[in-house]
Every structure is written in C-alpha cells, then in structure tokens.
C-alpha cells in the first residue's frame, strides 16, 4: 500500500511515523496509553476531499501547518487549540504551560506528570515505574509486555505467538500488524479499536483522548468507523496459534476448491446444453409438460352454469385454451377463445378428458360461507307441514278447521291462490302449516312448498279420487325426498270410497300400512271435524321419528315463499326460516337482492323482534323484489350482502343474454316463420310475486302456430303510469290480478286508449286471454258446392272477351262464385265468375233450369260441352288449440 516510510521518530513519549500513501501523506502517532475512548467523538476527520492534502494535514477549510490547526484557529508549532495561547508546551484548557506540559493544575516537568503523580522520564503511570512503560502491575521491559505475559520485541498480546509482525487474535502476521482479519499498517492501533489502510484511503481520523488531550491519526478503509472489542485476558500458547493458522489455511483452501468445482460444474452443464440434439430438447420439454400435468391434474368434475367461454373452461380444467380449441375443431365445432359454448357442448368436450360437468345455478356459484356450527346447540324444532292436493279437495277447509277460521272467505272464487303459512299449537307443541294452491297454474308454488317442508299431507277426495294435481303433488314430494301422510277427505259423504283411493294411490307407490306398506293413511272429514286429532297425532309421531333439529344460535337460513309490494310499507316478503334465528337489523341476501331487516310481522299481523327455526314471517327491508323460491340467508355484514347481491345480478344478466338467439342459416327459416306469428302483448301486474309467476307461466302456454302470448313486462304491485306508457308504446294490453290502477294511471290509460283488464280469479284471466287469441286467428276458408252449368254455346265479343252460353242443370250459379272448368272429366281451369247475365241484364244469381251468360275472369279457352262447377267460399271461425 505505502510507497515508502519517510520518517520514524519519537516525540515526547510517542512514536510518530510519516507514511506516503500514493498522493497522500499520513502522520501516525502511537500512544502507550490504551485509554482512548471508543466513541465517535474521539475521532476527527483529517482528510477533506474538497481541499488539497498538504504535509500540514489541514482540515475543515482551515489553513494548515505543521501545528495541526483545527476549528478555524491560527496555528503554530505549539499545536494551539481551543482559542488558547500556545507555545511549545502544548498548553490546553486555559492553563499556563511550559515545557513540562503541565495539565489539570498539576506541577509539571519534563516527565509529563499527570493525575498528581510524581513523574520521570520513564512516563510512569498508575504507580508503576521503569523505562519499560509497565502497566497494570505487570513486569516491564523493552518488549512492552502486557497482561501478565512474557514480552519480547514482538509485542505479543492475547495468547498469540509473537514475532516482528506483531500478530494478534490468531491471525497470520506480517510487518503490517494485521488485526481482526484486516490488512494492517505500521500504525499499532490499540485501545480495542481496529483501523487499517485497506484499499484506498477514504478518510483519516485522529483519536482524541479526553483524559490526556492528545491526538493520534489513523486511517480507515470505509466511510463508517469499525470498532472491535478485544478481550481483556486471553491465555495463549505458540502451539495453539500455529494450529489455528493451519485450520484457517485449511478452510481457505477448501473454499477455494469448492469455487473451482462450482466453476467446472457450470462449464460442464453449459457444454452439455449446447451439445444436446433437437430430439433431446423436445423429449425434455415433453417430460417437463408431463410433470406440470401431474402437478395440476384435470379435475374429475367441474361446475358450470348454462354456458361458459372456452377460456373459463380451460382455466377450470387446468388446460390451455389452445388445447380445447383444437379438440373442438376435431369435433367439428369452430370457436374462438372468448366464444361461449353451451352446457351440452362443454359436457361432450370435458368427457373427452375423462371428466364430467355439473350444471349449477347462480346460487351455487355465489355460496355464502356458513359459520362453524356447534352441534351441541342443536335442539328440537317444530315440524313444517305442507298441505297439497287437487283443487276443491278440501285442503284449505282442513287448515280452516285447524285454525278455527274460515280462510276461504279471504280468497276470491273460493280457491287458494297464494301460498299461506300458519302456526298452531297442539298438545303444547308447535306445528307450522303451509297451504299451497291446487289449481294447475300454481305448479311452482306447490314445488316450493315441497322443497321447504318436512312432511307433506296429501289431501285426496274420497269422491273424486286421484286427479292430475294429486299426481303432481306426489311427484314434487318424491323429488324433494319428503315423507307423505295421506288424508282421505269427505268420508262423511255417502258416495265416498276410501278403498278405491288406496288402490289408486298404490299405483304411485303410496301403499297403506294396513295393506303392508309404510305410508300413513288417515280418514278425515274437514267439514264434520272427523279424524282431525288423529291426523295431528300422526304428524307429531312422524316428526319424532325424523328427529327434526335446528340451531337457534346461528345466522338465519330460509326460503322466500312469496313477495309483494304493500302501499306504505314497500316490499314485503313471506319467508320460512329453516335454521337459525332472524333478528331485526340483520343484513341478508334474498336471491339476487340484499337488504336489512326493518321489521318482522307474524301471520297474525303482530310485530316481533326475532323469529326462530320452522317459522314463517313477513320481512320488511328488501332493496328490490326477489323471486318466489329464492334462497334467503343472513350475512355477517351489509357490505358482504351487497357484494354477493351484485355478483348474482351480474350472473343473471349473463344468463339472460345467452338466451338471445343468433340468426344463422340454420334457423333463418324458423325466424321468418316466427315473425309471421301474431302476438298478443301483455303487461302483467299482480299482488304478489307468486301470482305473477303462476299467471305468466299459464298465459305463455297459450301459443300455437298462428298466435301466441308475449308478456313484455310483469311485476308485483299496483298498475302505475309507467305501466300504461309502456303498454301504449308496445301496443299491449294491461292485465291486473288482484290489483287496480292508480287514479293517474287510469286517466292516462283513457287518453292513450290502453285497455286494462282486471281479474280476481286466475282461471277467469286465462279464459279471457284464450278468447282474445281465438279472435286473432285467421278463419278457415271452406268451398261449398252450389251448382253447375253446361256450356252450350261460345260467343266471342270483340273488346270484351269470350262469353259462355250456359244452361244451369243443377243448383244455382252466383256472381263472384269460384268455378272449376271441367272437360272430359278433368279440371282444366279454376277461376272466378267476373260477369253473370241473363239476356242483357246483369244478375246476382241464376236458378236451376235457366239459361245464362257466364264470363270467367282472365279465361278465353272455353269450349262447347265443358261443365262449369260453381262453389261458394265461406269463412269458418277457428277454435284456439294449443
């Protein structure tokens, strides 16, 4: 590092070395005292890059000299500091100096006496004497031995083998006084602080001892100060130091050997990679792909909705979109990556990979995470019973008897048109009953009733027996895997035949217990109150066998039975709670709608704060109108409810958009034919969502090849001005079921000539619409034979045409009649009579056995002997058939 050592000398008990480091000069002062503090304030930067380094080591933008001037003070040989008058005595701290370097009010001398100690040339400190600079009760000598160790010229320290190199801390030494694995210099750094000249010198620091007011310069290789504590007492032997040196050399050799091996391995792999053939690279890529496939296998089954894009299907199957597109091309289907394929195509495609497809609904795609349930909190719950059966078989009358009220008084036409929920108490136990409509239009209502119930009570008339809606109710119950109790009603009538009913039901798998089956049959008469108690006992017995339980402490889960708009209260939904407890203030999701419970109204019209499992309740607080049958579930927060609702609405829009047909060459003819259909456009309004759904489905079934019903809009609530405006724009009629128009809507309807039809009974609405459709049908055209005439003469009149002189041999001939010209028993022409005359007079008809002149429109090739048959066209009104 250093070019040469310019000077080595002693100045006042300290060794001074001047070393040239390339273009810089460093003055190194070594003290015998090791009490320099190990803090950053003990070091002063002697080098400043902004100033040129001179022999004077000037710093801090000050003019330098040999005096090592600092802090913008005038320098001199006296090393003046801190605004004090200097001299050779190195005066400090406002004290009068002399050659003796007197400090701290102590009598000085050449001996540099400090701390009230008697001095001498030997620089004796801490009651220790001798030229050897002895310290800490240690025997001194020229070797400057320390820490009870035998000294020598090598200045051995801390269990280290000495030599001229002044080796320390088990490190191989040299003239540089190496310490702490750092490259040293001649500076003899002590006081538990290690400095070195390693690399280029960045800064030079001066160690400042506050107790002696002396300085020493040293150099650092880094911009931060590195402090290393040296153990105070460490035993050392030359043999141990030698072993440590060998161990260090061995480790360095091993490390170098490892580096060489690593370089050789890298070069070898690089050479192997460059020498690989194309076949080897392809093989490795295939192996890599195989490993990736093993890491991401194709699932055994995937869930999709009605349709899915190729990219989404590829993601679900852990495949590349290009692979699926290629497979579809092989199957004869041309698609792009973002094109949708239907569930059938997706099923065929997925089966090619040995997997299967499950078609799910939007609710399966947006499952709300349920809370962890404590099974110990599940308790017995009341049974939910759905009463089902054919219309007029006595379902509602039975429920009236159970509640001791006449429910049919509140239903138009004496039939149930809404799904009702009621709770009764029998033998101190609660039972919840659901009454479903029996009319064929309310199929979906009956289906929902079967899905939310625990037991189905099938009411069958002992007179009528099994009817279409009876069979439908059986199928709904079996599909929902719900047990059935058969109640044979009207046994009080003389024509009742229960055995016939048992035989009919056995054909559908319902075999009575007394016939060896497992279905409970109860004979009742709702009108005479016969067998009601026995029926209730059987219901409770069946529920006990089923071990019905629920957890009232969890968040509520249920189903929307029906929904309506109530003036003054907004949207009111009838909800059956299947599990958990619903409280006022709960946030929830109902289908694609969200909300927060504002109020809970029981079936008796009483406001309650909460409702438990197996109870029906009216809920206020929906943000929009849900669909009947939608799932109902309470969420943790309102934010979660809004998020799920938004996602479900997007999925519903997506499902609706996929139903839009694309016009292709394959379905173009069907589209043209469909455009020729006559449509009856209807805007449908009803009191509850369930009635809207039932009536809409019934009306849309009224379709044939010529006419059809198109419900352009349907919703629950009163008829508003918006409905009238929509009807006027779309040329539709408005049907209100159990609702009336507002006053303003009625005025607007009169102005716009919009027809409003109001109904209270569902089959009245259906029959009226059927009659309207019949009036829209084109009548059938029938040709009725009225007579024929023989051509006896042919008269050609210029500018008029050919006139056939005829004799009416049978029936009569009428003007404008349709004729068939027959010659030799073959029809040669069919046309209309344009002129009929008797002599010169135009007549409307000519009777039998009279002569007349007949001119046929646009026909002149008539000959004598031809027979003219006359037909009258009649239009016959068609009857509507679906």
Swiss-Prot record:
Region (Disordered) residue spans: 38-192, 236-274
Residues covered by the tr-type G domain: 380-553
G5: region residues: 525-527
Ligand binding (GTP): 389-396, 435-439, 489-492
CDD domains, per the entry: IF2_eIF5B, IF2_mtIF2_II, mtIF2_IVc
InterPro entries noted in UniProt: EF-G-like_DII (IPR053905), IF2_II (IPR044145), IF2_N (IPR006847), P-loop_NTPase (IPR027417), Small_GTP-bd (IPR005225), T_Tr_GTP-bd_dom (IPR000795), TF_IF2_bacterial-like (IPR000178), TIF_IF2 (IPR015760)
Record-linked PROSITE patterns: G_TR_2
Subcellular location: Cytoplasm
Region annotated G2, chain positions: 414-418
Gene3D superfamilies named in the record: P-loop containing nucleotide triphosphate hydrolases (3.40.50.300), Translation factors (2.40.30.10), Translation initiation factor IF- 2, domain 3 (3.40.50.10050)
Region (G1): 389-396
Entry keywords, A to Z: Cytoplasm, GTP-binding, Initiation factor, Nucleotide-binding, Protein biosynthesis
Region named G4: 489-492
Top-level taxon of origin: Bacteria
Biased composition regions of type Basic and acidic residues, renumbered to the chain: 243-259
Region G3, annotated ranges: 435-438
Record function comment: One of the essential components for the initiation of protein synthesis. Protects formylmethionyl-tRNA from spontaneous hydrolysis and promotes its binding to the 30S ribosomal subunits. Also involved in the hydrolysis of GTP during the formation of the 70S ribosomal complex.
Annotated PANTHER family: TR-TYPE G DOMAIN-CONTAINING PROTEIN, TRANSLATION INITIATION FACTOR IF-2-RELATED
Family label: Belongs to the TRAFAC class translation factor GTPase superfamily. Classic translation factor GTPase family. IF-2 subfamily.
Name of the protein: Translation initiation factor IF-2
